[in-house]
Each structure stands twice: as structure tokens, then as C-alpha cells.
């Protein structure tokens, strides 16, 4: 169970537990609801499980940037595209731990370490494990995204103190091969299974704005809602088009469609932390407020998300103050 979920009061809410038997048609039907009805339903679900005035604040650090052999069409870190991004070596553990300490001092409660790899190599495991254990010792919730994992690697990361492992599905299965060809959908599902079997929490979501249809978005959420366990953390990214990538000229998704994505995610995965990930830099405070109303309860803080910009700390502090929201208490 997500440690941040608050107890349910059976006198006030439907005691039914989250479902794992959603059909694609049911998820599509949620997307088709009138906007205000959908947001109202999502807000009701949100209040069953969480304090709607609280936000979890996460910070993300790229511990190894660029040079990835994959061809994910949205990503600046692929070596297959000319994006002008210089590849870097894996950071030293001490550097990462110092960055995590700074993040905690700035208000972050969760620290995620990302490496631009297709898969984790055993030779890198000791250094990654040192990063994780050092960040964990600071009292932060730990997350990593390092590509595909074997069962033994997942167990080693768990032993090092990793709380969450991020491995996104990106989009629905019917649209996936239009975005990525170097890794199959099943590859991603297999890594998620290894993470679950190792006893770690899963962080898994996707991206909107890649040219997909509403049915494709429903397909992604249907996949997540029918996993053996819902993702403990569910990030939704609004594509930040990167010049030089195949999706560099993508048109922005309608803002209300992004809110619909948040709302449906909250309804079908009611106990997940639903995170607004990439894309907040170009969102108005009104749009973000709608997302929080629709069930988003986590954001990334810090001026950089891997290779894209994110709102400055002062902007986020002003946003929370304007909305009278507060950072989520540490579990």
C-alpha cells in the first residue's frame, strides 16, 4: 500500500477497494464524460484516499545523461538523434548524495535518480547502490529509473534501499510502436514484474501529446489499471517537444484533455500518487489548479527535469501559497 494513503472512513465513503478488472470500454467512457462531471468524480475519489490540500514534492537528477542506444521518439538523450546534447559519464555517488541533500533542504521529500541506459549493467550496480543507500540515509524517499532490469538486479536495488523504481509504459499498446521500436511493450511489463517481485514500489505512467488519440490514452490507463498491482506512483508527462527528435514538431495537447488524463488516472488508480511530471513549465497556474482538483497530488520541483526546464522554486512556492496547499507530510 502507498504509505501516503490516508485511512478510509467507512461511514463517509464507499468502502469498495480499487478495481483491477477495468475494461478498455469503461476507461474510454470515463474520458467521454462531460468535463465537470469527470472532474467532480475524480475529486470525490481523491478525497477518499488523500488529503486534497497536500502535494508530494519530488526532485529528479540525471545521474548519467545522453548516449542512449534507444530510439524513443520524444527523447533528447538518444544517440540516434541530433539534439546537441552531450553525453556524460555516470556521476560519482558523493556528487549525487550532495545533490539530494540540497534537494531535501529545498523542500523535496522524494529524490529520483535517472540514467540514460537501455538497461542497467552489472558493472554499474555497486556505484548505483551507493547512491541509493546514501540518499536513503538522508531520510528521503528514493526512486531510480535506469532502464530494463533483471530479477537479480531488482533485488540488489531493493537491498540497497530503493523504495520506487520508475519504468514508464509511455503510451497505449496500439500506439507504442509509433514512438519506440528498440524495446517492446512486453519488455517494459517484464521489468515492472521484476520490480514488484523484488518488493519495490512501482512508478509507471506515460506521456500525452505525442500524436496519440484519446483511445490510446485510455489504452495506457487501462494497462496500468489492470496490472497485478496499480502503480504506487503514476507520472503523467505533457510532451516537451525537443528539436531534432522525431516528435520535435508535435502539437501541444489541449489543456483540458490533459486534465481529463489526470482525472481518469485518479479514478482507475485511486490509491496511486498521480504526478504532473514534464510539461509544467508551460502550464498556467489555473491549469495546474485544475489538475490538482482532478486528483494530481505530486509534482517535480527543481529547475531541471533531465533535459527539460521545470518551474523555478519561487514559482512553485507562490503556486502553493495561492492555492493554500502544503507539502505532504513525510510518511
From Swiss-Prot:
Its cofactor is [4Fe-4S] cluster; [2Fe-2S] cluster. Pfam families: BATS, Radical_SAM. Binds 1 [4Fe-4S] cluster. The cluster is coordinated with 3 cysteines and an exchangeable S-adenosyl-L-methionine. [2Fe-2S] cluster binds at residues 112, 143, 203, 275. It catalyses: (4R,5S)-dethiobiotin + (sulfur carrier)-SH + 2 reduced [2Fe-2S]-[ferredoxin] + 2 S-adenosyl-L-methionine = (sulfur carrier)-H + biotin + 2 5'-deoxyadenosine + 2 L-methionine + 2 oxidized [2Fe-2S]-[ferredoxin]. The keyword Membrane does not apply. GO terms for molecular function: 2 iron, 2 sulfur cluster binding; 4 iron, 4 sulfur cluster binding; biotin synthase activity; iron ion binding. One of its GO terms (biological process) is biotin biosynthetic process. Coiled coil: none annotated. Keywords: 2Fe-2S, 4Fe-4S, Biotin biosynthesis, Iron, Iron-sulfur, Metal-binding, S-adenosyl-L-methionine, Transferase. Catalyzes the conversion of dethiobiotin (DTB) to biotin by the insertion of a sulfur atom into dethiobiotin via a radical-based mechanism. Belongs to the radical SAM superfamily. Biotin synthase family. NCBIfam families: bioB. This is Biotin synthase. It comes from Phenylobacterium zucineum (strain HLK1).
